[in-house]
């Protein structure tokens, strides 16, 4: 399925309940303008799912309840507008997941209760903007969750009751309250992290 470099104009882009089946799915370098983008309850089968360098507008971007099969999930260098970004209760399956170098805008960002079965998870060098950031009860699976060099601004950040083998915040900028009262974390790395508020452990 190939929507690379597609342009979605005025109105909502609604993919709710779509089953993309097995095989690669790409929206690389697509642009969404003037409406909400809805991938609620979608199924992405085994294969690469690619949203690299996608530009979203100021509407809500909603992936909640979606399922991803085995394979690489790529959201590298994606730009979100000012609306809410919702990955609540997603199942990211097995395989590497890249959210690197993303600009999340100033809307709230949630991955609450999502599951990553296995594979490295990277939010390295991403900018989370000024909205609230919620990783409450996320299960990061058997591999590392990397937030190195990410920027968290004025919105509160929560990893409350999350489970991970490793959480890395090397050289992060934490300008806000961060809740790290996790359920389980094998290794927590805050090396050279700049913290200007409270980190609750």
Regions of interest found by a model, annotated:
Residues 1-201:
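N-terminal leader/targeting and pre-domain segments
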